[in-house]
Amino acid sequence: FKGNKVQLAKNYSAPGFTTEKLKAPQLPDQAAIRKDKGASWFENRVAQPSAKTHKEYNAAPGTDLSEIIRSAEPGGIIVLVEGTYPIQSAMFIDKPLTIRAANAANKPLVRFNGEKSDNMVTIADGGELIIENIAFDGVLEPGKALAKAGISTATDMIQPYTLTVDGCEFQNFGEGGFFAIKGTKATFAKSVTIKNCFFRDLSGDAINYAAEKDDIGRYNADDMLIENCSFYRLLGLPINIYRGGSDESTAGPYITIRHCNFADCCNKERGSVMRLIGPQVLTVENCNFDNSGRVGATIRLDEATWEKVRIANCNLWNSGRMVTTTSQAIQGKMYNIRPAYINADAYNYTPVPGSELEKLSIGLKKNSLPQ
């Protein structure tokens, strides 16, 4: 037993070994090893992230928006001038894109006039969408199909996505199966941000991330922010978020809802303005409920004792009660103040400056939509 080499600490020796400093082994490149392995019919490729160009694409009324989106490069910005944009099929988002109005004060109007029911916008694998100051209108054209949703997801996604909706309007959708913004079953958003938006005259839900009903800890969006949004005359639920089961391997969703206004929403029996099932971390604050959830609830919260939930500084005027599972969710004082709005006839539900709600920082913030 001889001719062996070993690297030992000083003052140590081993019979049969020669002590010397050894070189670290040179391991082969793992990519080089793997590139020729696997089934012969499988093309072994590693997807490279696409560079974001931020190139602008201008669209005019009557333009085929689906075609512009198809041809746009990842990171592209599609700019719509004022006018009406009829679409016959969903705008398919499978890359990072921004769709925005050229002028926030004059929102472009998107209408669905396809022969077959579809979403107005569908987010698919690879999709990251920012959409700003666009109005989605559900007025039905004779002989045309109804839209299924304003913004929704493909049914066969395997990748997470992100969505930001800022300054948009969703209006005049009279079918109960319509959802303004919806996450479908087996889809997952890393983040969803909905702010400065206006939802009115909807028969279905405004914001629905409640498709996972198997009660095994799954949910449709991880990090959700709903801020400074106005809801008026909704038959469905303004906000519906569901995470069922008690699987401790899933830690979300994390939900923040603040400075929102609900007027004449979900006044059906056993209805809820907000239906929040199983959020792990939840903050609802500075919201105003006006003639909403009258024969049901303003907030229906199903939470466990260990979940971090907080409902604070809200106003309930002629509205339903808050229903919670534990006694820890409602913190601080709730108010019963008749709201005074800047111009409710023009759908501006911002509190009048100097009013009680404005002083308490309850309801919509300044410069809320619509103007």
Where are these regions (language model features)?
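Extracellular "leader-to-stem" segments immediately downstream of a signal peptide or signal-anchor
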Residues: 1-77, 355-356, 360-371
